[in-house]
Curated annotation (Swiss-Prot):
Mod. after translation: Undergoes rnf12-mediated ubiquitin-proteasome-dependent degradation.
GO molecular function ontology, one term from the record: transcription coregulator binding
Domain notes: The dimerization domain is located in the N-terminus.
Keyword vocabulary terms for this entry: Developmental protein, Nucleus
Domain (LIM interaction domain (LID)) ranges: 300-339
Extent of Low complexity compositional bias: 266-282
Function, in words: Binds to the LIM domain of a wide variety of LIM domain-containing transcription factors. Acts as a coactivator together with otx2 to stimulate lhx1/lim1-mediated activation of the gsc promoter in the Spemann organizer. Acts synergistically with lhx1/lim1 and ssbp in axis formation.
The protein's name: LIM domain-binding protein 1
Tissue: Ubiquitously expressed in the early gastrula before localizing to the dorsal region of the vegetal hemisphere, which contains the Spemann organizer. Expressed in the CNS, pronephros and tail bud in neurula and tail-bud stage embryos. Expressed in multiple adult tissues including brain, heart, lung, stomach, intestine, liver, spleen, kidney, ovary, muscle and skin.
Length: 375
């Protein structure tokens, strides 16, 4: 964001560059020039100007969704009024209806700031000047802070207008005071203000009315668009507002569980668990390696799959998984059912004690008396 002091409001064509400013943008000094154009258009006002003229004025200088805010302090406390695009034309018109014959804005040392899609103009020393011809010629100077946001496009229209009034002064020419110096009643009338905080009664009454009109803009727009009765428009708006209030908050998108990658064994062959441990293996958490067969693998080998961390998320699924591989030839249940195959195993020698059958119960009984007699 770039801030700079652009000086007082220029009164020259846009092709003329102010000395000392080296900024080269496609818009030149466009924000100041837009205020100059706004003042020039307001000077063209006549009493014959109707609603169409004011609507064209607002369309030229304000966005369709523009908001205008006025803040000031009266005897009964601070006031703040915010109106939308539909009510902005009537606001400027109310100033002239209150007795003003001329309106323009003077900016001293405004600061221009560039943002993504708009340009802001902040002037802490802004003066709104109005000329009044009735009941006596009076110049009203309203001092305050003006903050504007212009859309950064070819039209450079105002999106936000915020004028905060601090004080005001009402100036009367000395010649008029000299003319009525001998008239006490006239002097007493001249000493009274014709505005409140720089705003006429016509403008103040309109701003108070906007407190009611602004919320009704949705009803009026719906009535004009759908040709509904005022009661139906109110019911529809209230129902939609109620739906927005009771609508459940949108649930955050749940993240799909990451699929565990299959881990291949070093030999690339498959292994399967024994049939005797089917129930136990189902109750435990299996890894993909537990479904591999052991037909072509070296027997009695414990294989541990390496965890895959690249491309995955850290968590429980990234822990090292150790799978116990059961060899069917050492299964106790299989050994009981297939005793002959166990005894005829080539791993056992001919003189192995495992090949001799245990003596029967009758032979053991006949040997016992002999052993006792020898003793």
């Amino acid at each position: 964001m770039l801030d700079r002091d652009v000086g007082p409001t220029p009164m020259y064509p846009p092709t003329y560059l102010e000395p000392g400013i080296g900024r080269h943008t496609p818009y030149g000094n466009q924000t100041d020039y837009r205020i100059f154009e706004l003042n020039k258009r307001l000077q063209n006002w006549t009493e014959e100007c109707d609603n169409l003229w004011w609507d064209a004025f607002t369309t030229e200088f304000f966005e369709d969704d523009a908001m205008l805010t006025i803040t000031f302090c009266l005897e009964d406390g601070p006031k703040r009024y915010t109106i939308g695009r539909t009510l902005i034309p009537r606001y400027f018109r109310s100033i002239f209806e209150g007795g003003a014959t001329e309106l323009y804005y003077v900016l001293k040392h405004p600061k221009e700031s560039f943002h993504n899609n708009f340009v802001s103009l902040d002037c802490d020393q802004c003066t709104m000047v109005t000329q009044h011809g009735k009941p006596m010629f009076t110049q009203v100077c309203v001092e305050g802070r003006l903050y504007l946001e212009f859309m950064f496009d070819d039209m450079m229209r105002i999106k936000t207008w915020h004028f905060s009034i601090r004080q005001h002064r009402e100036l009367i020419p000395r010649s008029i005071l000299a003319m009525h110096a001998q008239d006490p009643q006239m002097l007493d009338q001249l000493s009274k203000n014709i505005t409140r905080c720089g705003l006429s009664n016509s403008t103040l009454n309109y701003l108070r009315l906007c407190v009611i009109l602004e919320p009704m803009q949705e009803l009026m727009s719906r009535h004009k668009t759908y040709s509904l009765s005022p009661r139906d428009c109110l019911k529809t708006c209230l129902f939609q507002k109620w739906q927005r209030m009771v609508a459940p908050p949108a649930e955050p998108a749940r993240q799909a569980p990451s699929k565990r990658r299959k881990r291949k064994m070093s030999g690339g062959s498959t292994m399967s668990s024994g049939g005797g441990n089917t129930n136990n293996s189902n109750s435990k958490k299996k890894s993909p390696a537990s479904t591999f067969a052991l037909s072509s693998q070296v027997p009695d080998v414990m294989v541990v799959g390496e965890p895959t961390l690249m491309g995955g998320e850290f968590g429980d699924e990234d822990e090292r998984l150790i799978t116990r591989l059961e060899n069917t030839q050492f299964d106790a249940a299989n050994g009981i059912d297939d005793e002959d195959s166990f005894n005829n195993s080539p791993a056992l020698g001919a003189n192995s004690p495992w090949n001799s059958k245990p003596p029967s119960s009758q032979e053991s009984k006949s040997e016992n008396p002999t052993s006792q007699a020898s003793q």
